Every structure is written in structure tokens, then in C-alpha cells.
């Protein structure tokens, strides 16, 4: 029986879990990934450090696995959505990764709400931009760090950065592509969407869209040396963690509501038609012709972490 490696990077912890093909956990490991808050409303982390922690978790999971790494048939990653992970044209991190807890672009999102941009975005993309949406963050970067904005080569999501580290290839998947820049009807990029946000200069930087289960690349010798994986192991495109959560819980189906209590509180349901509204995001489902409607609030497990760090530090360290 072959093995599968799943990687899950949330807003606090990165995890590597090895499963058999019956879905049983064979081994697992995790690493806490530090966040930095360099100024008010900025929540970010070092992209190279994120990969290092993830590689260590993979290595630990392999060490705890009673079977060799050569038994792993495929790898896939999932991670938090929204936020921003930028590379330059040479594939180097251009700035710290911005988490979906970041709110530096709040004024931009509010302005778009007032001037009609948000309404147009809802009509075309299925969602109104919010403070940590890639569209708002890129507009913030254009206004506040124009030199860095001009050097953007690739606009990625978190799990796409981790896959790049594993394979050296640039791509995203159907679910993650719909965080800001896809047509809600066609579920693909459209020429008129980037200009809604004044971001038409970045048409070259959007990654190719793959099916979540498509092979997006293979483990490079460099990644194999860091992790203990076998070079050449296939790596699938993966998917947004919100959608992955409902799928893993058995809640990815029409007429079923899935509830996620992680760093964010999320309520989601799948439909065979694009249903849009101001109170939720309508994003791509796992397959063409499927949509995932999700209502999201950043008021869940992260609040518990803050409470424990602030009031129970001694007990937590014990």
C-alpha cells in the first residue's frame, strides 16, 4: 500500500502528515511558525523561515514513519488563503509573506466599498475585497512601496510558495485562484478584472491554474536533501485549506454546511451554481462547475492563542 504526504500550513503551525491510502495516519510532525508584527495592522512572516520549518516537519514525519520515503506516491499541500506571497522574476521572496490576519489595506477596502469598486468586484469575482484580500494588499503595495511593486514577478498564495519550494514550479489551483482575480462565472482569469483594482500591470504575475489533483511538479534534489523525500516524487497542485477542511470532514456536498473552527471561524457550503451576495465569498469549488460559498470571521482559535499567550504564559511554558 502506497503512502501519501499531506502538508498543512495554517496561520500558526505547519504540519506534515503521512497517510496510507486507506486514510489512516502513519506519522505526523508539526512546527510552530513565528509571526512578526513590525507595525500596527501588519501581520507577516519570513517566507524562507516558513519553508525551513515546513521542511523540518516533513523530515520529522519521515523519521517517525516505519516505512521508507520511497513509498510516498504523491504529496499535496494546503494552507491559509488570502494574504500575499510575492516572488521577484528570479523566484526569490520579494517581501515577508503577508497573512490573512493582516489589515494594513483596510482603508483601501473601505474606499472601494464607498466608490463602487467593491460592488463591481462582487459582480465579476463573486466577492467584495476585504483588508487581507490579494487585490487590496497589492493596491496597498503599489501606493506605499512602488519600487517593490515594480519588481513583482509572481503573485502566490501560501501553499503555492511551499509547492514552489518543493518543485521549483509556479502554479496555483482552481480554489486558490478565485481569491480575487477570476471571473465568478467562467472560474478563470478575465482581462477586465485586474483593471478593476488598478492592477493591470500584474497580468504577467498571475500563476497558471491547475486542477487541485493535477501533478504540478516533482520534488527537486535540493528539496529532497532538506526533507528526506525522494527526488522526483510527484507533487499535486493542492487546494485552499477552507475547501480542504470541508472535504476532509465529509462536508463537501450540496445541501451540507461545513463549519471550521480554526484561526478563522468559517461556515461554508457547496453549490452547482454561482450564488453571490455581500455577506459571503463565492469561490471556485474543487472541480469546474462547483462553487463554495463561505462566510468568514477572524474570531476563532487565534483569540484563544492570544489569551493563552497573554494570561497563561507560565502555564503554557511548563
Task: Put a short name on every predicted segment.
Residues 38-42, 95-98, 284-294:
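Short beta-alpha connecting loops at secondary-structure transitions
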Amino acid at each position: 500500500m502506497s503512502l501519501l504526504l499531506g502538508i498543512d500550513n495554517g496561520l500558526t503551525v505547519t504540519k506534515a502528515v503521512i497517510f496510507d491510502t486507506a486514510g489512516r495516519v502513519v506519522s505526523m510532525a508539526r512546527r510552530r511558525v513565528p509571526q512578526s508584527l513590525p507595525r500596527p495592522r501588519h501581520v507577516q512572516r519570513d517566507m524562507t523561515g516558513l519553508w525551513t520549518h515546513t521542511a523540518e516537519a516533513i523530515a520529522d514525519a519521515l523519521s517517525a514513519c516505519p516505512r521508507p520515503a520511497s513509498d510516498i506516491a504523491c504529496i499535496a499541500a494546503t494552507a491559509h488563503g488570502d494574504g500575499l506571497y510575492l516572488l521577484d522574476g528570479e523566484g526569490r521572496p520579494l517581501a515577508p509573506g503577508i497573512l490573512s490576519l493582516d489589515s494594513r489595506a483596510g482603508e483601501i477596502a473601505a474606499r472601494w466599498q464607498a466608490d463602487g469598486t467593491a460592488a463591481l468586484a462582487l459582480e465579476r469575482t463573486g466577492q467584495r475585497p476585504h483588508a487581507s484580500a490579494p487585490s487590496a494588499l497589492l493596491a496597498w503595495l503599489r501606493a506605499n512601496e512602488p519600487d517593490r511593486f515594480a519588481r513583482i514577478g509572481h503573485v502566490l498564495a501560501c501553499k503555492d510558495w511551499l509547492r514552489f519550494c518543493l518543485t521549483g514550479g509556479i502554479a496555483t489551483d482552481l480554489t486558490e485562484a478565485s481569491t480575487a482575480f477570476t471571473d465568478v462565472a467562467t472560474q478563470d482569469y478575465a482581462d477586465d478584472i485586474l483593471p478593476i483594482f488598478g492592477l493591470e500591470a500584474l497580468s504577467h504575475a498571475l500563476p497558471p491554474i491547475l486542477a487541485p489533483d493535477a501533478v504540478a511538479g516533482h520534488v527537486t534534489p535540493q528539496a529532497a536533501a532538506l526533507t528526506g523525500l525522494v527526488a522526483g516524487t510527484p507533487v499535486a497542485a493542492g487546494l485552499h485549506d477552507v475547501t480542504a477542511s470541508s472535504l476532509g470532514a465529509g462536508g463537501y456536498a450540496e445541501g451540507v454546511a461545513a463549519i471550521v473552527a480554526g484561526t478563522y471561524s468559517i461556515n461554508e457550503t457547496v453549490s452547482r451554481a454561482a450564488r453571490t451576495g455581500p455577506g459571503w465569498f463565492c469561490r471556485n469549488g474543487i472541480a469546474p462547475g462547483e462553487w463554495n460559498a463561505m462566510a468568514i470571521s477572524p474570531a476563532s482559535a487565534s483569540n484563544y492563542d492570544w489569551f493563552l499567550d497573554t494570561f497563561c504564559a507560565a502555564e503554557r511554558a511548563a
